[in-house]
Amino acid sequence: ARQLDAVTGDRAVILVSADLHSSWCNTAAMRKLGIEGDGFLREQTSFDVQTQLSQVNPHVLDGWVGSCSTAAARLGITGIRDMEFSTDVETWLQREADGRCPLRVEVSVYPERLDEAIAQGLATGQAPVTDKPGPSRVAMGPLKVIVDGSMSTRTAWCMDSYPAGAGPDGAGIDSVTPEDLVDLINRAKTGNLQCAAHAIGDRAAKEVLNAFEVTGISGSIEHAQVLTDADVRRFAALGVRASVQPLHLVDDRDATDVMWSDRADRCFRFADMVRAGTELALGSDAPVSPVDPWGAIRVAVERTGDRRPSWHPEQALTLSQAITASTRHVTQVVTGGPGDVIAVAHNPFDLSGDALAGLTSDLTVVGGEVTAAAL
């Protein structure tokens, strides 16, 4: 804190890491927030501070969400999974009633509100019954559990230590114990809720896969940034989806070569997972990375987002694989299907590089209703 004080003086300042897993506070900010320590906050303590900073008038927030949702529809996005700490199904139903929900939304729940979510009686993917004509676009999501931290904050829980890694052995930390994780998933199971587990390090991923195996329910691992060979093969066998964010590769490739140089060839193993039969889902993890579906597809295919050479090109997806992983593995429009369609002006199979990344939607349709049109 004192180092930041020298630059900021008595004005309260909090610098939040791009990965959101750490924050740096000066003394004035610590005093204002009522926290103690050296000013460097990691994981839950940092999340708690960010939650305090994010407090805003609900009507203002709903307006922002509506604007962002409309912008997402223009990019060709038809659905999102909301993993904010403080959101809920009722909030999104009200936004839908107010005309601020042009997307399908699955609303995740954190352990602190798990019992409340179970009491609602909605399974993951199930929409509540409303007075609105037709089915709601809002549905219950999974239980979200943060199992470890991030590479940049040096809290990702790994098999092996890394430079300045957190934890007693320098290999990162577990945000929830394996025993507690199994307990949480079993509780979610009673309410027919799946689990989406944040796991960046290979030790975290292994423990999550172990928990899925013990409990016998399906779900996803969010990020799966570094994996052992053995665990790559376990995803398909257990029916676990790998929810990955290609744009993190652009953000993390340089840091990976420094901090995880001994395991860089085991990071962002998109091709290996597909070859092993894993269901891959491409996403953004916004606001950590931009909401940029075609940019993510470009990186998944080319393993670079700029003019630098491909980073570990052996893990590149084909364009067909990347598009499939971006559309919930729906590859064709069929009678009785959900009616979610986008139209683009150029054939993506004729494009590469910035041209592919720059694609936007000329027409976005959700459930048969036009949600964005540039035609």
Identify what each model region corresponds to.
Residues 1-107, 134-189, 364:
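Catalytic pocket of metal/acid-base enzymes, prominently hydrolases
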Residues 77-78, 192-193, 240:
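A structural motif
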Residues 90-95, 117-125, 205-215, 234:
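Distinct, well-ordered alpha-helical segments
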Residues 21-23, 79-81, 87-91, 113-117, ...:
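Flexible loop/turn segments at secondary-structure boundaries
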Residues 28-37, 116-142, 227-241:
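Short amphipathic alpha-helices and their capping/turn segments at secondary-structure boundaries
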Residues 63, 185-196, 200-219, 223-224, ...:
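His/Asp/Glu-enriched, well-ordered alpha-helical/loop segment
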Residues 353-375:
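P-loop/Walker A phosphate-binding loop and immediately adjacent motor/lid segment at beta-alpha junctions
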Residues 16, 82-83, 104-110, 141-146, ...:
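A cross-family glycoside hydrolase active-site/sugar-binding cleft signature
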